[in-house]
Curated annotation (Swiss-Prot):
Coiled coil: none annotated. Belongs to the peptidase M24 family. It is an enzyme of class 3 (hydrolase). This is Uncharacterized hydrolase/peptidase y4tM. InterPro entries: Creatin/AminoP/Spt16_N, Creatinase/aminopeptidase-like, Creatinase_N, Pept_M24, Peptidase_M24B.
Length: 392
């Protein structure tokens, strides 16, 4: 039995684009370690990335080679498009061993397949490519030159296919249901963790037609004074009256994400806070209006900045980031960012989370929108109204 969510033709096109980038950078072999990149190129999907796993992509060999822990071989057989002979497990003696390392095994397989390889690309900034991984590879491959291939595959992922966008739309529907339940359950006297429980239930149950998966991150929920924090975790404390809650969450459909943030006010917001919300909403709308092919990420940020500067407010952190397929710890793709100096040009199929969030000295507010760039503008991935939610 094979569980694949894309056609062989799509996987082949992805691999072709990766090899074209490898050729342009003079890379003979690419060692892919970022879980989202391995999934993108083969379909591999298991929670096994806490041990060493890699996909070896060869410039002169048609098929890549998956290498992972022996007990995870079955997951590779079930979830990838690779024939069994390209699924290579390493024995458990390499797992969490002080004197052995799976990089030694990976090096052996690389030399067996490409003995004349001169340059090897590695993802230096990937979360699951450690300093020891790199040091062990260097020791095991003393005659090759290592090149930093950080984000090589990530940039191939930047433009989504129609099937990918369809999965992101489905993730967006789950996101909407999660936020709806959060708003329904959250109220003064309710424990924060009970709001989280309702969110998780909506996240996993999904819709009548498809379910969800755990997102890369727990819901970031800042209640009361902690609304000033961008990435707080919920507690078992009860919600106060006349307080604010910032809730950031994302549905996940086959590892594809569509995040959203909303602010909930419990009680009657003072006019100053209503004004702040109106400024943020106006700036978000202005930024979305600027989205179209040919515009740069910096251009979108400029639209936000002009809108907010009219009210004397400056956002120091970035306004957004590219999204798509992702694994823990982040649903961001780590490529394009909506901010000053990012001259990435928007193209149809690129997807972003426009993060209209402000974390100020005495409060915070987050009203955001995930979207896909289209031929004429943008398509929102969620339909939840962009507004301050008031529960009086």
């Amino acid at each position: 039995m094979r569980i694949l969510h894309f056609s062989d033709a799509e996987y082949q096109q992805r691999m072709l684009r990766v090899k074209q980038r490898m050729q342009a950078q003079d890379i003979d072999v690419l060692i892919v370690t970022e879980p989202a990149n391995i999934n993108y190129l083969t379909g591999y999907d298991a929670w096994s990335f806490y041990t060493v796993q890699a996909l070896l992509v060869f410039q002169d060999v048609d098929l890549p080679m998956w290498i992972g822990r022996s007990i995870d071989k079955q997951s590779a057989i079930v979830t990838t498009n690779l024939p069994d002979e390209r699924i290579i497990p390493y024995p458990d003696i390499y797992v969490h061993s002080p004197d052995r390392h799976a990089a030694q095994f990976i090096a052996q397989m690389l030399l067996r397949e490409a003995p004349r390889a001169k340059t090897v690309g590695v993802e230096m900034g990937a979360y699951y490519y450690t300093a020891r991984d790199h040091a062990e590879l260097q020791k095991a491959l003393p005659n090759v030159a290592f090149k930093d291939a950080e984000l090589l595959v990530n940039w191939v992922r930047f433009i989504k296919s129609e099937r990918e966008i369809a999965y992101m739309r489905e993730a967006g529907v789950i996101t909407e249901r999660m936020m709806k339940r959060a708003v329904e359950v959250a109220a003064p006297g309710v424990r924060q963790c009970d709001v989280a429980a309702a969110i998780y239930h909506a996240q996993m149950s999904g819709t009548e037609n498809y379910g969800g998966l755990p997102a890369t991150s727990p819901p970031h929920m800042g209640f009361g004074e902690r609304a000033r924090e961008p990435h707080p975790i919920f507690t078992d404390r009860r919600i106060d009256t006349n307080s604010v809650a910032n809730i950031e969450l994302s549905g996940c459909r086959l590892r594809y994400h569509a995040p959203m943030s909303r602010t909930v006010y419990f009680g009657r917001p003072p006019q100053s806070y209503r004004d702040l919300a109106s400024y943020v909403i106006e700036a978000v709308e202005t930024s979305l209006d600027a989205v179209r092919p040919g515009v740069t990420c910096e251009g979108i940020e400029l639209a936000w900045r002009k809108s907010m500067s009219a009210h004397g407010i400056e956002k120091e952190n970035r306004l957004g980031y590219s999204i798509g397929i992702a694994y823990t710890p982040t649903w961001g793709e780590r490529t394009a960012s909506i901010r000053r100096t990012d001259l990435t040009v928007l193209e149809p199929g690129a997807a972003f989370h426009l993060m209209g969030g402000l974390w100020l000295a005495n409060t915070g507010i987050t009203i955001t929108q995930s979207f896909v760039v289209t031929a004429t503008g943008h398509e929102p991935l969620t339909a939840t109204p962009r507004e301050l939610v008031v529960k009086d």
